[in-house]
UniProtKB/Swiss-Prot annotation:
Family membership noted in the UniProt record: Belongs to the PlsY family.
Lineage of producing organism: Bacteria, Pseudomonadati, Pseudomonadota, Betaproteobacteria, Burkholderiales
UniProt keywords, alphabetically: Cell inner membrane, Cell membrane, Lipid biosynthesis, Lipid metabolism, Membrane, Phospholipid biosynthesis, Phospholipid metabolism, Transferase, Transmembrane, Transmembrane helix
Transmembrane segments annotated in the record for this chain: 4-24, 58-78, 86-106, 120-140, 162-182
Name of the featured protein: Glycerol-3-phosphate acyltransferase
GO biological process, one term: phospholipid biosynthetic process
Gene name of this polypeptide: plsY
C-alpha cells in the first residue's frame, strides 16, 4: 500500500471515528432525551449535564475525548509501517475533529469539539494536552465561564504546540482545529459580549 493510499484510509477512518457522537449514543443507551432537543441543542457533555444525569455527562466527556485521542494515537502508531509522514498525521487530526463537528452518523449535527480537541492534543503530546487543559482550568476557575475557558485554550493551543515541537504541518492542523472550535462557539461569544452567558454552576440563561 502506498503512503498516499494509507493516508487517505487513515483520514477516512479518523473521520468515521470522530462521527460517533457519544452525547447521542450515551443518552440513547441510558434512556435520556436526545441532547440536540433541549438546552443549547449541542450534543456535548455540558448539555448532557443539563439532563440532570452526571454519569451520562461524564461518559460523554470521556468518550468524546477518547475518540480524538484514539484516532491520532493509532495513526501515529501505524504511520511508520505505511510510510505516512507528519502531513498524514495532520490530516488525521483535522479529519477526526471534522467528524465530531459534522458526524455522518448523526445527520451532520455535531458538537463544539472541546473534549475531542483535548483528546487529540493529549495524543499528540501529553505535555501539550496538559498545558492546554491547565489553561482551561485556570480560566474556568477565575471567570467561571466554560465557553470562555474553551476559547482561550483554543487560542493558546497552537502556540503551545509550536513552543514544544516547532512549526510543521501538525502545527497548522492544531491552528485550524482552534479556528473551527472558535467558530463553533459563535453563539457563546455573542452571549459573553452581551453578558448573557451562563457561568459554571448556573442554570442556562434565556437568550
Amino acid at each position: 500500500m502506498s503512503p498516499v493510499v494509507a493516508t487517505v484510509i487513515f483520514a477516512l477512518a479518523a473521520y468515521l471515528i470522530g462521527s460517533i457522537s457519544f452525547a447521542v449514543v450515551v443518552s440513547r443507551a441510558m434512556g435520556l432525551a436526545d441532547p440536540r432537543t433541549y438546552g443549547s441543542g449541542n450534543p456535548g457533555a455540558t448539555n448532557v449535564l443539563r439532563s440532570g444525569n452526571k454519569k451520562a455527562a461524564i461518559l460523554t466527556l470521556l468518550g468524546d475525548a477518547a475518540k480524538g485521542g484514539l484516532a491520532v494515537w493509532l495513526a501515529q502508531w501505524l504511520a511508520p509501517r505505511f510510510g505516512v509522514d507528519e502531513t498524514g498525521i495532520a490530516l488525521v487530526v483535522i479529519a477526526v475533529f471534522l467528524g465530531h463537528l459534522f458526524p455522518v452518523f448523526h445527520r451532520f449535527e455535531g458538537g463544539k469539539g472541546v473534549a475531542t480537541a483535548a483528546g487529540i492534543l493529549l495524543a499528540l503530546n501529553v505535555w501539550l494536552g496538559l498545558a492546554t487543559l491547565a489553561t482551561w482550568l485556570i480560566i474556568a476557575v477565575f471567570f467561571r465561564y466554560s465557553s470562555l475557558a474553551a476559547l482561550v485554550s483554543a487560542v493558546f493551543a497552537p502556540f503551545f504546540y509550536v513552543l514544544m515541537n516547532g512549526f510543521d504541518w501538525i502545527a497548522g492542523a492544531v491552528a485550524l482545529m482552534a479556528v473551527l472550535l472558535i467558530a463553533r462557539h459563535r453563539a457563546n461569544i455573542a452571549k459573553l459580549l452581551a453578558g448573557k452567558e451562563s457561568r459554571i454552576g448556573e442554570k442556562k440563561k434565556a437568550a
